């Protein structure tokens, strides 16, 4: 039988180590709403000085995104935010010319990931989850509108 707990502990790392996978020109997907990867966002923002033109997709963001605060701090667009749904936080970012809007209906989002012409690529998916269960599974939480499709991409 596979010892999932051992595998989990061997792969467990810090947010600072995890974001080292991000390179210039990559497309990142931030999970949305309650699954926004806050610790990874903060760690990635600390790497802003060493990165250029990292594209990020996300939506239903209810608090300031640290990577975009890093853009302001550096006075350059290291991280290019692409919002799938404009709500309060996204509108504020768009007014400051810090966000692009990708219009669609909410129900279309999973299909966008299935069609390569609509979503170019998903190089990295950042998502906040709860801890692993005894069977090696992670609960992705209540915010899964297109998470499965993003993972499969």
What are the residue ranges of the model-derived segments?
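Conserved alpha/beta enzyme-core scaffold
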Residues: 1-153
